[in-house]
Amino acid sequence: TIYAIRLQSKRETFYATLAGRRMPTFATAGGRAMLACLDERHADDILRRSRLVPLTPRTLVDPDQIRARIAEARRDGYACVQEESLMGEIVVAAAVVKDRSMPVGAIH
């Protein structure tokens, strides 16, 4: 996942900048939402090739737990993560798809 822009509210201050930064697909709401749009075999192949290194103490790195969250996103049409890529951050994301199936990005 690559973040293009990040807008902060009037009440919150960001202490980390994500714009232009790459984040692991398995640990972000946008990444999981996009993986949920793929067939299970393709998503599993991407997950298998990923370095499952925690970004925070709350990052899921167990492949079965990550697969379960991807399945939830597939069922619900969106993904949620809580403090898995940045502490103090809760993110909800939905994939942006091309031709009704190929994910090309995500809205967080």
Locate each region found by the language model.
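Broad hydrophobic/π-residue packing in well-ordered secondary structure
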Residues: 26, 37, 55, 77-78, ...
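Generic structural signal for secondary-structure transition and capping sites
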Residues: 43, 51-52, 75-79
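Short, hydrophobic secondary-structure boundary micro-motifs
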Residues: 45-46, 56, 82
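Substrate-recognition "cap/lid" segment bordering the active-site pocket of phosphatases
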Residues: 57-61
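Intrinsically disordered, low-complexity polar/acidic regions
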Residues: 55-56, 87
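Extended hydrophobic
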Residues: 62-108
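Amphipathic alpha-helical effector-binding/dimerization core
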Residues: 1-49
